[in-house]
Amino acid sequence: MSATAAPAATRPVISAWSAVSPYGLGAQALVDGLSSGRSTVAPVDGARWGVPEVPAHLVPGFETRQVLGKKGTRSMDRVTGLAVSVVGGLLDQPEADRERETGERAALVLGTTTGSAESMMDFTRTSLRGEAPFDVDPAVMPNAVMNCAAGQCSIWYGIRGPNTTLAQGRTAGLAALHYSTRLLSSGRAGSVLCTAAEEFSRARYWLERHSRAAEAGDDAEMALGEGAAVLLLQRPDTLSPARPALAEVLAVRTRVATGDRTRPVLEACVASALEAAGARPGDVWAASPSDAPGRLGERERQALTALFGTETVERVPGVGRLGDVSAASSTFQIAFLLATAALSDEAAGRLAVVTSADRDGSLACAVLRLVAP
């Protein structure tokens, strides 16, 4: 599949979105939460999660079996439950066309960090503690595989086209967006559910706590968050009146850099994406950084502010209000952008830039053209 930019007439468009977030279930809960500006942070139940009573941004009251029902969810882990729930939220919208959005011509792409670290560690632990290494619960084995969540989404809703999991940390959402556009432009799918999910768990808490301690300048710890977001991508010629275009994906570009090189390389990445989109910095109405913890997030925000100005960078609420949602960050950023643009008379036809930066060095930038609601 060529990464060459598609002609304007065939550039993929985003026609719908949904979310399961610390604001609640569904797109409207996110819109209402952003409008209210309310905080989603609260101390976690230490006994329930096996962690200190630290602040975190959890999806309120989310229990997989209560949300999805008891059938087929006995051994489903949290990240899979979040992913299946968010896809269902989009497919259950009144405007949805199940015939087009599921089936053999529908694809699903999911961005993640590692899948479920909790499931991987639990499965390994039982193997080490059992009388024999194979004394494990076979029902738990699928959860320990990174592509479990994506596979369950497709099985649950009958999505029989390409099914892909991309593990890329904080930039996974934009990697999934890029991959989704290539599936459409190559004709391998008629629609794509572009998804990203991140869970809160004991394993993730301790991994983040110990790994962040080694990062210079990251003394101010960001509370962990969780959730999932999904975008429906289609070719313009397959749109229906019920699902009009919300945004056109003009370009996605990536780079790699760490430390002091992050800011200049990110600026080069943004410049490359704008060039591919045939745009200039002055054309950009909103720019959304991924609010990475510590110095990395500071460098990312400084780069966008230098390119576009403070007003442009602050036009869309920061994804950091959901805490550190890691792999789900950039998909939530796009959801925030679409929610904000829908309430603005000046957004239609304007450009938006979404960037993401991961501490392992991956950088990404997407350029979108907003469409009037």
Feature-to-residue mapping (PLM):
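Condensing-enzyme catalytic core mediating Claisen C-C bond formation in acyl metabolism
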Residues: T10-A16, V20, Q28-D45, E208-A286, ...
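Active-site-adjacent elements of ketosynthase-type condensing enzymes
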Residues: E118, E198-D218, V256-A268, A292-A306, ...
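Conserved beta-ketoacyl condensing-enzyme motif
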Residues: V13-I14, S35-Q152, W156-Y157, G161, ...
